[in-house]
Amino acid sequence: MKSQLLSLAVAVSTISQGVVGQEPFGWPFKPMVTQDDLQNKIKLKDIMAGIEKLQSFSDAHPEKNRVFGGNGHKDTVEWIYNELKATGYYNVKKQEQVHLWSHAEAALSANGKDLKASAMSYSPPANKIMAELVVAKNNGCNATDYPENTQGKIVLIQRGVCSFGEKSSQAGDAKAIGAVVYNNVPGSLAGTLGGLDKRHVPTAGLSQEDGKNLASLVASGKVDVTMNVVSLFENRTTWNVIAETKGGDHNNVVMLGAHSDSVDAGPGINDNGSGSIGIMTVAKALTNFKLNNAVRFAWWTAEEFGLLGSTFYVDSLDDRELHKVKLYLNFDMIGSPNFANQIYDGDGSAYNMTGPAGSAEIEYLFEKFFDDQGLPHQPTAFTGRSDYSAFIKRNVPAGGLFTGAEVVKTPEQVKLFGGEAGVAYDKNYHGKGDTVANINKGAIFLNTRAIAYSVAEYARSLKGFPTRPKTGKRAVNPQYAKMPGGGCGHHTVFM
């Protein structure tokens, strides 16, 4: 009897570890993953429990945020790591890195009237500089956009086309002593220059209304501006969390990710606790199944400061390793209170920016998810404003979902998705009000099920998916070479 029990124990152990040559994909006693079965494992109560957990990490510390390198984010990273490690289903690692954190505050007045301004992170400081205001043409992305008399002045620039960092650099090249960027959509504007640059000048953001008013004043007379920017800088150690299924073909990796950090201003529960918990919920549900292709989940750090964690990760892979990643799915803000179901425009049909080969197929898959349920959806552009940026620059097919940030919802969109016209998709975007109460439960549940739908599809098979061409070491697709490399979310305000 003892020998029989010993034999049985050895057999069970062998099965649980996977027998090389007999069951290459592991977990033979589990059913093969299907779209319906994985979606059925997604429960709203599990999603909201995770959302509440992230809120608790913010609440536990005086900063009341989960900004990278801070205590709230450290708690987030440890929890994600431990939760996944405990499943036994994943090989989990923390990828350590050091990045420069920046926090800036601005005060701005024009002709003695105070304006509500936000300093761009990584802005050089300004000690109450006073100068005449001039207005850049177009979007301030080219040297020819700046008036000949820009030297020694503060320049007003409209948001759009290029990054805030490039606008600040162009202003510096034109010998301006400061730059004020105003929004091109209703609402205030806070953003980042994406990093330090000697060409940058002190830079602040203004609302569309205030910016247009200033431009009108300049057109009719002289405007004197006083600008003060206080900037703090600190090198901080932080981590990505990477979890890859032990089972599945590790030469055909399906990868998905979401950033785990917040801005300084608040806990970041929609931005991007929603995406973080969405993929976490799917990762836990996936442990009930076996699969054919390995699935790699990533929680990126320091996205809000220039996509730093995802860029660090992609840069750490040579072309041979990156070629194993057959596609990348990005989920950034999937629980917006005034949501719209938006899918990255992989085929370029809406925004004339086509993703690498395979991106169109990803878009079509998500379209099918919504179409099969009779639900509306719309495309959203590949702007480079989220963690997919580093992947598409290296020709990795990408796609994903987004429910909206600072952009105002139109009456036409209300007819499709409900909600309130004239109000931002997320009125608490990048603010202290981005709490649990900011989450639209219907939106986050639907989009998490969509994540499960896509993961099950590609974990089972990549049949019909375009084959990735092999390229040289660290080759960058020239179509995306000038895409901004810093920011905070698809929504990220660095451009």
Curated annotation (Swiss-Prot):
Residues 1-21 form the signal peptide. Its EC number is 3.4.11.-. It is found in: Secreted. The record marks 429 as: Transition state stabilizer. One of its GO terms (biological process) is proteolysis. It comes from the Eukaryota. Keywords: Aminopeptidase, Glycoprotein, Hydrolase, Metal-binding, Metalloprotease, Protease, Secreted, Signal, Virulence, Zinc. It holds the Pfam family Peptidase_M28. Binds 2 Zn(2+) ions per subunit. Zn(2+) 2 binds at residues 271, 304, 430. The lineage of its organism: Eukaryota, Fungi, Dikarya, Ascomycota, Pezizomycotina. It comes from Trichophyton tonsurans (Scalp ringworm fungus). Its cofactor is Zn(2+). Extracellular aminopeptidase that releases a wide variety of amino acids from natural peptides and contributes to pathogenicity. GO terms for molecular function: aminopeptidase activity; metal ion binding; metalloexopeptidase activity. Glycans are attached at residues 142, 235, 272, 352. The gene is LAP2. This is Leucine aminopeptidase 2. Residues 124-218 form the PA domain.
